[in-house]
């Protein structure tokens, strides 16, 4: 889901000037990213190098936030499409759809996470403080989406008669377990508390990682003959 999936993404509504999702539509903060911001962004292009290696030489710090915003909008559209599907929940239209949702977000975060963990700078540190809490809010919204979880539960309740092979059965088990462990079955009041804890942990984890990296970079050992 999202940060660990890959696949074709649903198109999000666009205007010539910008792509956006409003808070009233999603219950989440509004996100707007312009076509101009995305122009020439390597994360919006197909990577043709062997093994899909990212074009690191073409990526600069200014590419991360626009690409992240666009990918989040695509993730929201993917989730909305699953929830709004008028057909009865099935393994394909619910479990597989969740598994491949938000693949473009994974593309950005794989690079961003590795770079910020190994070769960060002040600009990237500021981006971390914005991007990770933003993603935590998105994941909270997905994990606590009751309509989405009801579809997952429906498929899971039918697992013994779906005729799934070992791999698909494992995927169904993992998706259902992930929702449960992230609090999908909790009461609304407890979900609110968990969401707040998740956001606090996101900020603290980012801060700890940044301090650890700075400490590692500052370390030195003197060797004398």
Where are these regions (language model features)?
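Zn2+-dependent metallopeptidase catalytic domains
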Residues: 8-225
